[in-house]
C-alpha cells in the first residue's frame, strides 16, 4: 500500500529529504506556472482518507471529566510545543511518494503534514517503531526553541476512544474535507506565499497563520497564537469583528464583481488584507499588530486618496455606487477633504485621524518646548525693593555674555542656577520675566522657557522624563537660554517612601539633567517656590541651584518705592509725604498687595467722582482727568484688602497707633538704642564688616548672644511696644516662639518639635529675630521638657550668631524666674506714662477733636441730587466694517467650496465614457432636427461653464439642469428601441449625480441656501474695499460743522473763526455749569481756571450772558465786595484774634483738668479715655449740625470742659 514509507519495514530508518514550501503547496487548477509531481494514487488516497471524522456527540463524551485519558508521555508535548517559527506546516498535497536516499536527517519532512486524524492515529499507534518515528518527526529542527502547547496528543487520545462511532461519521467527514479544500483554494487564491501554521489547528481552519504581521488576531481558533505572542490592549486598539465558523461560506464561489472592484482582478492580497473568508477584508493601518506604541504616537495617516480617473491608482475609498467613481476627487486638485464640500462616510476616519495623535503627544512628544514670547514692556525699573537680587541675576546671565574673558582668565564657571523662595506676591515671577526681557534687549537674543509646577507631568509612563529631556536639549540648541520653573515644589518634591514613585523618577531625571555627565552649556535655571522646605534637598547645592534668593516682605523704603512705581503714570500721583505715610502704615503688604491697593484706591476715587455711572447702563461723557485719588481713598482701600501674609499667619510687627504714640514714643527710642548696641547687624555697614575680617577667614565678633527683655507692670503698653520694635526691625526674618505659635504649627506634632523647627529655620535665615510675647506666662505654663529643650537650643547657638532673642514680660525684676535666660543687662524696664507723655497725649487729643470740624465743613448736610452727565451718542447699529468684511469672506468661501464640488462632479462625468453622449452639445451634423425638437438643450460642458461663471448658488438649479438633460433625451429619442439605451444612460447620469451630491457637507448646503434666500452673496461697499483702519478719521471728520457744510456746497459768508468761537464758548460754559453744580469748592476753583482767557483779560467784556444763569447776580458786585473786604480786613483782624486767644485759653484750662484727673493712668486707661472723648465729640457735632450751630469749636470745647469736670468719667 505504501511501499515508499520510511516508517515501515525492518531495515534502518531512512529520513526524507526536506521539501520546500513550493513543493508542499497543493497544485492550483487555474493555470499557475508551477510544476507539480504527483503519483497515480494521489487523488485516490485523498478520496479514501476523508472518512475519518469523529461524531460531535462522541467527542463531547470523551471530553467529559471522568473520561479524559491520562497523559501518554512528556516527550511528545515538549517536542510538539514549538515556537511559531518551527511549527509543522500544513501541506495540502500528499508527498508520501517522494523519497531520497541521501541521508536520514530530515525524517520530519517525509510524513505528510496534511492528513486526516484516523490515518495519523493509525500510523502513530500501530507499532512502537512508528511511535519512535513520531517522536523523531516532532523534534525541533534546531536547539534552544521554546516549547508550546499543542493539541496533537489530545486529538490522538480522542481518536483512540472513538472507534465505536467511526462508521457513522465517515460521510460527514468527507463533506467537511471537501469544504475545507474549497476554503484552502480560496485562501491560496489570495496569497502567493505559504504561511506558517500550527498543526493542532485541525482541518476546519481554512487559512494559515500569518508570518508575523497579518492576521494573528483574526484566526477563528487563535489559542496557539495567544500563547505565542502577548496581547496588548494599547497595540490592538481597533475593534475586530470576528465571524463565527458557521457563517463562513463552505462552498467554492466565483469571484463577485464587488470583490473584483475592491481588490482588482489579481490574486494577491496586500498586507492590509485579512483572510479567512470568501473575500479579503480591508484593515485600517492602525489595526496592524506590528505597529508599536511609539509609531502610533508620532506617525500620521499616510493613506492619501488617489486621482479618481487614474486607472492604475490606488482606490482605497468606497466605490461610487456601482459606477466605479470614488470619493477622493477633491484631493486631486491639491485640496484636502475638509477644504472641499465632500462629507462621505469613509472620510470620517481619515479626517479624524490624519495629523491627530491617538495616544499621546506630537512629534516632539507633546512638550511645549517653544520659547516663550515675553512682554517687552517689563524691565527692571518696574521692580522695587529687589535691587541686590537684580545685580546677582545680571552676574549670572549678562556678564558671561558680555565679559567672558573674566571667567576664562580665572578658569571658573559662572553660576547657572538660582532658587527664588519667599512668600507669595514678593516678585519672584516678575523678576524672572524682567530678566528675560532685559536679556533679549542686551544685544544677543536669549531664549526663555517657562514651566509652571506640574506642566510636564503626564498620564503616560515615562512621558514626563521625556519632556524634561526634550526641554533641556532644545534649550542647549538655542543657548544662551533661560529655563524658569515656577512653583518648582510641585515638580521636584522631597523624595521619600511616602511619595509616589513617579515623582521620584522625575526628580532623579531633573537632577541628572541639571548637573550630570554632560555639560549644560549657557543654560540658566531659575526656580521659584514659596515652600522651600518642600523641594528635594539635592537641588539646593552648587552646580544645580548655585544661589538662593530669599524674597522677604518689603520694608518701609521698599514699599514706598513700589507705590511710586505703580502711581508714577497717574495724571495726579500722590505726594511724596502721602506715599511715605502709606508705606509706614502698610505693614506686611507684599508687592502684589500694594498694586491691588493702588487699583482699589483709584476705583473708589472714580466711584466718588462719578456715582452716576453705577445707576445707568448708558455711557456718559466723563473727564478722567478730574478724578483725583486722595488719602481717604487709600484708607478705604486698606480696609477692604487683606494682605496675603496676613491670611496664613499672624503678623507680629505693627507700628504704634496714633493714640498711644505720645505715651510710648520715648520707650521706643530707648529700646531701639539698646538693640543697636547688642544687635549691630541692624546698623552695621559694609565697610565695618570689611574691617572686622581677619586672616584665615576669621572675623571680629560683633555680636555676643543678643537678648532683650521688655519688663513692666500691668498696663505699661508692652503689647504695643514689642510689635513696634519688630516693625522697626522688619527687614529681618521674625520667628514667633509664643505658645499659640508652637501649638498651631501644622508641621509639628508636639510643641518641642515645633520649637526645634523654628530654631533651625532661624539659624538658616540669619540674621533673624526670635520673639516671645508674655514670656512670664510662657515660662510658668511650659512643662519641664519644653523648658529643657528651649534652654538646650539657646545654649547650642554660637555666641557670635546674629540671632536676637526679644521677649516681653509682666512683673518685677526681683520676681523674675527666667534669669537664666536674660541677665540684668538684657532687661529694659517700662514704666507708666509720665506727665510729659500725658501732656503730649492730650495735646494730640484736643487737636484731633477740633480737626473733625474741618472734615465736616466740606461735606453737604444731606444727600444732594446728582447732576446729569452728558451721554455719549450711540454708534450706528449697523454692522461694523470688520463684521461686513468677515461675512463677505465667509460667503465667498462657501460658494467657492460649492463650485469646487460641482466642478468635481462635472469633471467626473466628463471622464466617464458611459456618459459620452451628454458631454458636449449636439451638433447639426449628428442630429439635424435636434434644435427643432429640443428648445433648451443642455449638456455637461454647459453645466461646467455655468459652474465656472458662478451661476449656481445652490445645488437645486444644478440638479434642475441635470433633469433637463434627462427630459431632452426622452423628448428626442422617444420610446423606440434604438433610443432606449441613450435614455437609460441619461437616467443613470442623473442617479450618479444625485449620489455624488448626497455626499456633500449638509452644513455647506444649508449655508448656501441661506445665501440664496438673502438674495445672493453680500458685496463689499466701495468705502470698505480698502483698509478698514482708514475709516475712523473719515467718520470723525464727518461730525465737524465746517466739513459737512463744505460737502453740501454751502458758501460761508461769515467769519468762521469768530462764528466758531461764538458757538464754542456757550457750549463750554454750559458744560462747566452742569459739572460745577455737583463739585465742591476746590473743584469750582479748578474749573474756573479753565475758563477762556479773554474774559480774564477784559473785565468789561464779562457781561451777563443767557448761558450764565445763576451767575448773573454774582457778575456785577464782585469788584465791590472784594474792595469792601479789603477795606474791612484790618478792622476784622481784631475780633478774630480775640476769638483765637479765647479758644487757646479754654484749651489750656481743659488740658490742665485732664492732667489732674489722669494722674498715674496706665496705657489701657488712656486708650479707653481717648475713645470715649472722641465718641462724645462726634455726638456733639451731630447735635450742633441739627441745631444750626454757627460755632462748632465752642461747642467742642464746652463738651470737653463738662467732660473733665465730672469725676465719674475718670
Curated annotation (Swiss-Prot):
Belongs to the AAA ATPase family. Residues 897-1000 form the Bromo domain. It comes from the Eukaryota. Residues 276-286 have a biased composition (Basic residues). Residues 97-109, 167-226 have a biased composition (Acidic residues). Keywords: ATP-binding, Bromodomain, Nucleotide-binding. ATP binds at residues 422-429. SMART domains: AAA, BROMO. Residues 1-11, 1080-1090 have a biased composition (Polar residues). CDD domains: Bromo_AAA. GO terms for molecular function: ATP binding; ATP hydrolysis activity; histone binding. This is ATPase family AAA domain-containing protein At1g05910. PANTHER family: AAA DOMAIN-CONTAINING, TAT-BINDING HOMOLOG 7. PROSITE patterns: AAA, BROMODOMAIN_1, BROMODOMAIN_2. Residues 130-146, 227-244, 1057-1070, 1108-1123, 1138-1151 have a biased composition (Basic and acidic residues). Residues 1-32, 63-291, 856-883, 1057-1151 are annotated as: Disordered. InterPro entries: AAA+_ATPase (IPR003593), AAA_lid_3 (IPR041569), ATAD2-like (IPR045199), ATPase_AAA_core (IPR003959), ATPase_AAA_CS (IPR003960), Bromodomain (IPR001487), Bromodomain-like_sf (IPR036427), P-loop_NTPase (IPR027417).
